[in-house]
Amino acid sequence: MALRLRHAALLAGLWLASGVAPAGGLQVSPVSLTLAASQNAEGLWLSNTGDNGVNAQVRVYRWTQEGAEDKLTPSRGLVISPPMLQLAAGDRQLVRAIRLGAPPSGPGAAQEAYRMIIDELPVDTAGKKGVQFVLRYSVPVFVEPAGAAAAPAQLSWAIRREGDKPMLEVANSGGTHAQLANLSFTDAAGHRTELTPGLLGYVLPGAQMRWALKPAAKVFAGGGTLETMVNGQTVQQKISLVDSPR
């Protein structure tokens, strides 16, 4: 059964600045993984910096993007070890993503994308009052193809008017994911509008994603320059508002 991944961008954005995912007593580091074609496994650390024990479950899903939405399906390419763990206060545990079979290969082979879903599970709270918060984290995992390096992300951009709502469309025809962050727009008169501080989201190879922008469509009517961080590098793109086909 497929899972929709609507919360992942928010979680990743919270982690982006520090490189560590905080969750009360539970911390995750690093917050993304990449397996080279020569690697069979890569790992991250789960740490408990709280005063009480933590139980966690770790699963992995194949991550694709269809119809401008993130989609998770059961993974046949990676497995997790260990999938269940208990961490006493002050403990940490290495959790590995292990590749099954060969990496992507062949002419034009692209990265494969996965998500590690880390759930903090309820613990025995007998005798304790208050609400127990149980959290979920989503960590991107990328598997590089064998042979020649995957083609870098190749992005095309558009801002489309849907009523008075502007929608940003980004398509990636390259073989590598694009992580988008810190989006801003500067109009022809030099007025700058911050659109998305922190992480906007990802565009996987061969996929197209769409995001609603908060300003009214008229802000973009005269065209201007879109600036964003793409995989940590500042990119500027001339852009104008277009009407969606009816």
Q: How should each PLM-predicted stretch be described?
A:
Residues 23-50, 147-165, 200:
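Beta-sheet-dominated interaction scaffolds and their linkers
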Residues 17-20:
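N-terminal signal peptide c-region/cleavage motif recognized by signal peptidases
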Residues 162-246:
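Intrinsically disordered, low-complexity segments enriched in serine, threonine, and glycine
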Residues 102-146, 218-246:
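Terminal connector regions
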Residues 42-48, 97-98, 114-119, 166-172:
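Buried hydrophobic-core signal for structured, non-transmembrane domains
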Residues 50-72, 173-191:
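Short acidic, flexible loop segments centered on an aromatic residue
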Residues 71-103, 192-219:
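Intrinsically disordered, low-complexity Pro/Gly/Ser/Thr-rich segments with frequent PxxP/GP/PP motifs
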Residues 1-10:
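Bacterial N-terminal signal peptides that target proteins for export
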